[in-house]
Amino acid sequence: MGKQIALLRAVNVGKRQVPMGRLKELMGAAGFLEVATYLQSGNVFFADGGRSAAENGGRLEELLLEEFGFVVEVVMRSSAQLDGVIAANPLPGRVADARRYVVTFFGRAPEAGVVAGLRAEDFEPDEFAFLGDELYSWSPNGVHTSKFTPQFLSRRLGVQVATARNWNTVLKLRELAG
């Protein structure tokens, strides 16, 4: 069995509270195997149970809605896909300050024409690169000043689900996914 990583969008901010301990219990009771979490920002690992990422992601979204009463969008990646995200890093010189280097994970890849339009814009001093279902961005003045928020990217790119993790978290997710 392979490992899958569920990246929950916008949890544990404001009234959208999803205690990771409770989520782990719920997932175990629902038949998810080898469930573990990292941080309170919605990072969950589990054995795929012979099911696709889409199937497990859908099951998890249903479980979250039933238990917590609000929609939580989930972006799924396999441990092999996360390996690819790390290996393909298009801005390797920017990882020295990993808190300012972010990977935004999309539920599906944005359309090429929309990506080209965004590439034509000037976001200096920020730098960014698209690869597949991810956008890598470096914000030298800090991520809090960056325009590359999941909300901005979802709106501009027409991609409904996007969630971001800094490079330190991406590396830790891969380590923990085994």
Residue ranges of predicted features:
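Surface-exposed, charge/polar-rich loops and edge strands
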Residues: G2-G178
